[in-house]
């Protein structure tokens, strides 16, 4: 069976790395995620990763508490690099050649982000983990994921959610009548104000015709199911599938 997508970017929340601890980094949890990604990688799919930093730091609350917003955001970018390094180490543990590239140069721990080099790594079947956001404050890791996916010409962004199995018209934890969408267009997401990604990230995905698949990463095997075309979660594209 052939994969539906040949090149993907997986977007993980920082909280996904915290496991049941809720904050920080839980190494067994990271290793479990890395194992699942490695199993997909064996099929020949080219994989890049963007990981948030919310398990270690959140810039907006820090800014609300009086910290300079720019400094708060830069602090968050460093958190994403920590997550990237830990994930890369776990992927290496499973025999996957992995590179970390950061938007802020820190040559002692990672490569600088260079698009051509990232593409060569992918073509050589290496996983690339992008850290430090886009290197500028005020931009989320969702926007980073959409931008890097466009730059590496990914077929899809896999939004691996922590316990959320798709996109709903209301919060299913608060509304028992919430309805899950199987398919949406990027335009519908923006028009309805659905908070899958921020508006900048949604527009980037729409303009570059990148599919977005939102699914529950807590169920083992779901990344592979998405890659091989099994319809789980919610698929967002420029054209709703038949």
Swiss-Prot record:
Q: What is its EC number?
A: 2.7.4.22
Q: Which reaction does it catalyse?
A: UMP + ATP = UDP + ADP
- Give the main EC class: transferase
Q: What pathway does the annotation place this protein in? A: Pyrimidine metabolism; CTP biosynthesis via de novo pathway; UDP from UMP (UMPK route): step 1/1
Tell me the first and last residues of the signal peptide: none
User: How is the quaternary structure described?
Assistant: Homohexamer.
General function of this protein: Catalyzes the reversible phosphorylation of UMP to UDP.
Q: What is this protein called?
A: Uridylate kinase
Report the source organism: Streptococcus pyogenes serotype M2 (strain MGAS10270)
Gene name tied to this protein: pyrH
